[in-house]
Amino acid sequence: MFNSVLNNEVFVAAITGVEIIAAVTRRSRSSSISGDDAAIVCNQFRHDVQTDYQVIEMTEKIINAGMSLSETQGLRGYDAVQLAAGCAVNELCLISGLPPAIFVSADNELNVAATSEGLAVENPNSYP
C-alpha cells in the first residue's frame, strides 16, 4: 500500500501517538503481543514520528471541526479529530494544487465517514 519510492508525505494528527502507544501497550498487557515486541513497536513509532511523519498540531479549527464531525457522523472523539485533521490536510493539498490526500484507516466506521466527507480512503486491512 505504501511505496517509499513514490516519496509520499505521511501526515498524522498529534493525537496519533497517544492512540498508537495506548493500543500497543494494551495488546501487550493482554498478552496478544510480547512486552519486548511492544517496546520495539513503540520505540520505532516514536522514532518515525520524529523523522518521517508530518505531525498535524491540534488547532482550534481542527478541534471545532472534530466536534462538528462527532455530531454529523456519530464518531468517537479521537476518530472525529483524526478525520478533521485529514480534512484539513486534504484542503491544503487542494488549495496548493497538489493531488488530494488519501486518508488511511483500518476503522470501517471512520472510513465511511471520511468517504462521506469527500476524502479518498485506503484501508490497510485490504492489503495482505
Predicted regions and their residues:
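Short, well-structured N-terminal submotif of metal-dependent ribonuclease cores
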Residues: 1-16, 27-40, 125-128
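Acidic, PIN/NYN-like endoribonuclease modules and their adjacent C-terminal/linker elements
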Residues: 13, 89-128
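Helix-adjacent hinge/juxtasegments
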Residues: 26-61
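Alpha-helix C-capping/helix-to-loop hinge sites
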Residues: 5-8, 27-30, 48-52, 69-73, ...
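Acidic catalytic patch
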Residues: 16-17, 49-73, 80-89
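Conserved phosphoryl-transfer catalytic core
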Residues: 20
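Short active-site oxyanion
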Residues: 7-10, 52-54, 98-102
